[in-house]
């Protein structure tokens, strides 16, 4: 089931197909939730979570869940410091709570024992700081998780290989074919303890005030994902969140790992 990935916004398709949202790829037409919003920074991720939860409860009631779900929660992109829009902190709190509500629902359901949730960013480059900006977020959530972290280099193709191995799927390309599944996160026995979502301490209704960064943000395109200039937006976010802390500038590092047998 697809929730928001490669989906046209409602205004682009409503008059054509009579549905609010539709997958842009033919393979997604019959598997996309017509009620789940795609990228739109004026829509809360709580709204997206509400739609997902409504469908999930139906799956629980009927005792059947799709083998693979792709769920897009885009509000961690933020709208920079745009006046009147949620602050970056509020957007992130919204994003975190939506994810937490999804994990809570799965972990309290009969599907928890047989479900793994993989959390990644849509892009493997992030704002620059003291760490190479090609790094990205990866969270593996399941009843079979070992506590702690796995200390090894993981690429996006490794994540795909992990999902393919769990689902019993063939590789999509030579890249994920040679990916190394992240088996080290899983334990021999499950821990069925459910998760309860934590309400953010940040006010999710907090709005950006007028500021020099608000004027800069007004010049950026937030209508599409990643349409805003990266460097400009990163500097705006840094100033908004860090204040007078010096901007670190981009860090680039050669990434490699010696793989021994």
Label the model's feature ranges.
Residues 1-261:
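N-terminal pro-sequences and low-complexity stem/linker regions of secreted or lumenal proteins
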């Amino acid at each position: 089931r697809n929730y928001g990935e490669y989906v046209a916004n409602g205004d682009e398709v409503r008059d054509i197909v009579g549905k609010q949202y539709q997958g842009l790829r033919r393979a997604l037409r019959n598997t996309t939730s017509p009620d789940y919003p795609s990228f739109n920074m004026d829509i809360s991720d709580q709204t997206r979570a509400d739609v997902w939860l409504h469908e999930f409860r139906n799956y629980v009631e009927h005792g059947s869940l799709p083998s693979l779900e792709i769920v897009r929660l885009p509000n961690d992109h933020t709208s920079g410091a745009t006046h009147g829009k949620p602050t970056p902190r509020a957007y992130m709190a919204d994003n975190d709570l939506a994810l937490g509500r999804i994990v809570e629902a799965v972990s309290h359901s009969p599907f928890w024992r047989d479900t793994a949730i993989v959390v990644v960013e849509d892009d493997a480059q992030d704002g620059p700081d003291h760490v190479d900006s090609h790094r990205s977020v990866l969270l593996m959530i399941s009843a079979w998780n070992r506590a702690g972290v796995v200390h090894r280099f993981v690429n996006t193709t490794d994540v795909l290989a992990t999902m393919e191995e769990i689902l019993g799927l063939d590789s999509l390309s030579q890249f994920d074919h040679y990916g190394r599944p992240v088996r080290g996160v899983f334990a021999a026995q499950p821990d069925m303890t459910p998760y309860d979502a934590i309400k953010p301490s940040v006010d999710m209704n907090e709005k950006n005030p007028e500021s020099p960064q608000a004027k800069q943000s007004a010049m950026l395109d937030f209508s599409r994902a990643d349409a805003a200039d990266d460097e400009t937006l990163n500097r705006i976010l840094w100033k908004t969140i860090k204040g007078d802390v010096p901007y670190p500038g981009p860090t680039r590092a050669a990434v490699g790992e010696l793989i021994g047998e």
